[in-house]
């Protein structure tokens, strides 16, 4: 029997506000343990939360970017549970009336087709702290993350394969990043994914028993975990067994999902309205103000790169996959850089350098200005493409002007015949055996002189000019 896969995803995204959702403490990632905390984060008696307006701004932008309806009458709810990283013993979240609902996003699949994935809801909430279990028998609580603003985006169960889930996450990450509300860095926990997956016989409308997958710390692991679950559940069902409602984690080392716990039923969090935060209304004017702050999104930007700049669909997709790269490209082209040349450098040498160094574009010294200048001095013959690779590495590590560096480092290409011809004659004098081979008509003997000349000029001879002059001088040599 063949089965249809049904997948829904829950994605937590940390919003990039300066302070937390209900306290003025910094929401910055990477500080020392418990450095970003105050009495509200520790839930001292008598403290009251104060809503950060910037969080609601970000929530509105997310809802608009994901084609969602917006609940204009806003309130928060208490989600009650006890855990050491949650000192209040409840989380302030949204239950029955999330900020956004009934949305969708269009995703592009590997075969080039597109599919619209529904989004059930997006709600605002506070993050919990972090527990660390030490080898000394103690557990430690870091509340830096406690109160960091989150938006949880819950998809409809519209995905029918791990490939579609991967495509959905890719598209969602792009939209959130372009909207400017999160850096969506999974390695820093600012984007976290839980997956729900079930199988059912083709033609059956009722969903099968679902499994929840956790510990999915990359899009690749989401895909691998789901692929494993499809196989695991199908084998159980084909053998006559039943799927239990479980929470499982993906074990990257074993490339398998591991049981965490069996779910007996839905958790009862005893939601009720948060009494310490008043109701408020999101006005049409507020919504429109946030709409005006939204940028051009990846789909529209890709289309413009193809139609206006003449890039291929592939190049446009690669450039727009990351907003930082796309914005860099935009600025370089605005400065007069040739779109195709800038694209080639960003996807070629720049990407290779970043991968080798383990860095991002923001972490190196290359700027749109010095990249455009470097491309210009390649075009005008000041440097060769080969020398440009060395110049690029210097710019990436040290910054500064491309032309200034080339001149100071003595890398300017030699194009003057008055300089090159004497060097060619010296090459002939230094390589008598090669000259003899050439004069005797030995096949491909002339090719050796190209290498000799480039070595003599330390690679600085303009290849086009040098080859033309070399051919001219070789012809004279043959006549003598």
UniProtKB/Swiss-Prot annotation:
Top-rank taxon: Bacteria
Signal peptide: none
Entry's Gene Ontology BP terms: glutaminyl-tRNAGln biosynthesis via transamidation; translation
SUPFAM superfamilies, sorted: GatB/YqeY motif (SSF89095), Glutamine synthetase/guanido kinase (SSF55931)
Pfam families linked to this entry: GatB_N, GatB_Yqey
Catalytic reaction equation(s): L-glutamyl-tRNA(Gln) + L-glutamine + ATP + H2O = L-glutaminyl-tRNA(Gln) + L-glutamate + ADP + phosphate + H(+); L-aspartyl-tRNA(Asn) + L-glutamine + ATP + H2O = L-asparaginyl-tRNA(Asn) + L-glutamate + ADP + phosphate + 2 H(+)
A molecular function GO annotation: glutaminyl-tRNA synthase (glutamine-hydrolyzing) activity
Enzyme Commission number(s) from the entry: 6.3.5.-
Keyword annotations of the record: ATP-binding, Ligase, Nucleotide-binding, Protein biosynthesis
SMART domains associated with the record: GatB_Yqey (SM00845)
Keyword Nucleotide-binding carried by entry: yes
InterPro entries registered for this protein in UniProt: Asn/Gln-tRNA_amidoTrfase_suB/E, Asn/Gln-tRNA_Trfase_suB/E_cat, Asn/Gln_amidotransferase, Asn/Gln_tRNA_amidoTrase-B-like, GatB, GatB_C_1, GatB_Yqey_C_2, Gln-tRNA_amidoTrfase_suB_CS
Reported function: Allows the formation of correctly charged Asn-tRNA(Asn) or Gln-tRNA(Gln) through the transamidation of misacylated Asp-tRNA(Asn) or Glu-tRNA(Gln) in organisms which lack either or both of asparaginyl-tRNA or glutaminyl-tRNA synthetases. The reaction takes place in the presence of glutamine and ATP through an activated phospho-Asp-tRNA(Asn) or phospho-Glu-tRNA(Gln).
NCBIfam families assigned: gatB, PRK05477.1-1, PRK05477.1-2, PRK05477.1-4
Subunit structure: Heterotrimer of A, B and C subunits.
Protein name in UniProt: Aspartyl/glutamyl-tRNA(Asn/Gln) amidotransferase subunit B
Gene: gatB
């Amino acid at each position: 029997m063949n089965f249809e896969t049904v997948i829904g995803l829950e994605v937590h995204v940390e919003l990039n506000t300066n302070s937390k959702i209900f306290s003025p403490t910094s929401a910055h990632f990477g500080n020392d343990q418990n450095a970003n905390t105050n009495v509200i984060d520790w839930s001292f008696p008598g403290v009251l939360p104060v809503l950060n307006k910037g969080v609601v701004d970000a929530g509105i932008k997310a809802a608009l970017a994901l084609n969602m309806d917006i609940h204009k009458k806003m309130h928060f709810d208490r989600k009650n549970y006890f855990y050491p990283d949650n000192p209040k013993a409840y989380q302030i979240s949204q239950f029955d009336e999330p900020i956004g609902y009934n949305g969708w996003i269009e995703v592009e699949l590997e075969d080039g087709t597109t599919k619209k994935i529904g989004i059930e809801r997006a709600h605002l909430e506070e993050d919990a702290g972090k527990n660390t279990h030490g080898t000394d028998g103690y557990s430690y609580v870091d509340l830096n993350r406690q109160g960091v603003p989150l938006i949880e985006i819950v998809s409809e169960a519209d995905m029918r394969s791990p490939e579609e889930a991967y495509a959905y996450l890719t598209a969602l990450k792009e939209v959130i990043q372009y909207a400017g509300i999160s850096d969506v860095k999974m390695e820093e926990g600012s984007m976290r994914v839980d997956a729900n997956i079930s199988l059912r016989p083709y033609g059956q409308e009722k969903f099968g028993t679902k499994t929840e997958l956790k510990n999915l710390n990359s899009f690749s692991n989401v895909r691998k975990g789901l692929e494993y679950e499809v196989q695991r559940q199908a084998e159980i069902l084909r053998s006559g067994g039943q799927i239990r409602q479980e929470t499982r984690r993906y074990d990257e080392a074993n490339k398998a999902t591991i049981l965490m716990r069996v779910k007996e039923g839905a958790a009862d969090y005893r939601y009720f309205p948060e009494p310490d935060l008043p109701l408020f209304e999101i006005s049409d004017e507020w919504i429109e103000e946030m709409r005006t702050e939204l940028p051009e999104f990846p789909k529209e930007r890709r289309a413009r790169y193809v139609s206006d700049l003449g890039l291929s669909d592939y190049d446009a997709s690669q450039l727009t996959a990351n907003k930082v790269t796309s914005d860099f490209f935009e600025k370089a082209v605005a400065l007069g850089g040739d779109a195709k040349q800038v694209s080639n450098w960003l996807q070629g040498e720049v990407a290779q350098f970043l991968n080798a160094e383990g860095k991002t574009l923001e972490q190196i010294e290359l700027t749109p200005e010095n990249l455009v200048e470097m491309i210009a001095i390649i075009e005008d013959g000041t440097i060769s493409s080969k020398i440009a690779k060395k110049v690029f590495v210097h710019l990436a590590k040290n910054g500064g002007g491309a032309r200034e560096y080339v001149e100071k480092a003595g890398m300017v290409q030699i194009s003057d015949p008055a300089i090159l011809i004497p060097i060619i004659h010296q090459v002939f004098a230094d390589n008598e055996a090669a000259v003899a081979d050439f004069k005797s008509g030995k096949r491909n003997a002339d090719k050796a002189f190209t290498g000799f000349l480039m070595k003599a000029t330390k690679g600085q001879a303009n290849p086009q000019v040098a080859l033309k002059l070399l051919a001219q001088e070789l012809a004279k040599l043959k006549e003598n």
